[in-house]
Design a protein with these regions (language model features):
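Active-site nucleotide/adenylate-binding loops and adjacent lid/helix of ATP-dependent enzymes
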Residues: 5-9, 13, 21, 113-194
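ATP-binding N-terminal substructure of ATP-dependent carboxylate-amine bond-forming enzymes
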Residues: 1-109, 113-115, 119, 138-146
Length: 194
């Protein structure tokens, strides 16, 4: 009997665009002789499975199941193909742990830690791992790019603290207006609606 796999994609951040692309690749490479794959889109509007006719059916979050043609579908495992929150920050992992549904990726605690760059750097440094010099900026306490420029050697990479590694990331080669724009971009992308 084939295993039922939920391929989770989407997300609540700008990284959803990347998640959808990843899901296409994952979907193409899962062995259909072994697995029945259901692509589940999690986005700010809800959690859905799209039927062949284009109609969407909502996921029952009480047990992460869905109804297809009156038949309840429960999943044997989840393939997390989501970038950003809630797929990389431990939220989905914790949810699936609660439901005792196995999933790909690391556990909830590891996901939560590694999604936060500041915490990850602190734990790595405490463990004796060499880390690059970095400065964490707090949005409401941040005054200007000049206050941090002297603490860093250019070029620098500016990234959201609680985001992925692609959306909101900028490489800045020298102190300029570009540095301030990169910081603002990171602040925008680092905030998630849910």
């Amino acid at each position: 009997m084939k295993k039922r796999i939920a391929l989770v994609t989407g997300g609540f951040s700008g990284e959803a665009v990347i998640s959808y692309k990843s899901a296409i690749t994952i979907d193409k490479n899962l062995d259909r002789e072994k697995f029945d794959v259901y692509k589940i889109d999690i986005n700010p509007n809800g959690w859905f499975y799209e039927l062949a006719d284009g109609a969407k059916t909502e996921i029952d979050k009480n047990d992460f199941s869905l109804l297809v043609n009156g038949k309840k579908i429960n999943f044997d495992a989840v393939f997390i193909g989501m970038h950003g929150t809630p797929g990389e920050d431990g939220k989905l992992q914790g949810y699936f742990d609660t439901l005792k549904i196995p999933y790909t990726s690391c556990d909830a605690a590891t996901s939560a830690l590694t999604f936060n760059k500041r915490f990850t750097v602190a734990v790595a440094a405490f463990s004796g791992i060499s880390v690059a010099n970095s400065v964490v900026l707090i949005k409401n306490a941040f005054q200007s790019p000049d206050e941090v420029a002297g603490k860093l050697k250019f070029p620098v990479f500016v990234k959201p603290n609680n985001g992925g590694s692609s959306i909101g990331m900028s490489k800045v080669n020298k102190m300029s207006d570009e540095f301030g724009s990169a910081i603002e971009k990171a602040f925008r992308e680092g905030s998630s609606p849910k």
